[in-house]
Amino acid sequence: TLALTDVNGLWGFIRFVQHCRSSRINPIAGVNLINNKQEVLILVENQHGYENLCRIISNMHDDPNGDISDILRKYHAGVFVLGYDISILKELSSFIPDSHLFVELRPGFQESTIKSISEELKLEIVATGDVYFKNKTFHKTHMALRAIDCNSTLSDLNEFDYKSEDHWFRSEAEMVHLFPNSLHALNNSKYLADRCKT
């Protein structure tokens, strides 16, 4: 199973599904929803969730700096939502059941910080790769593409405009090495993937 979560869209999803099917990999639809205030990861649970994901993305494009919580309040059925920011997770927990809301542990975050958020909100942790490039050697290419997209030079890129070199595609063993104290979060990612039927 593999999820593609483009930023604010389903840009590569059709090709992703074609490649997954030809490789006998179960594809999961999703999106990394980001604006200048908030960020969440959304994974589709079922067909109704896919329809809601399309509505979420449309609403995000209609109002790019709108409140992600307001959009999800209307369209959270059939999707799983993962976040790492305690303020948006608190807000989302008022209307999304804990069976569909999770704390995201991703590269670059301290396991202890994520664990304390999980304990405070009584939400399970799910580990993700937050992948933006194939391996570490592609980080320079990522930086160059981000500079082009931002109409900037490499030296003038804002740190929020690119990902660190931690965001490469890891094997299961490499994920265990990255998060040695969070094996339950890695198991939860498998459990969540099994629940996604797109």
Feature annotation, model-predicted:
Residues 1-198:
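Phosphodiester-processing cores and adjacent nucleic acid-binding clamps
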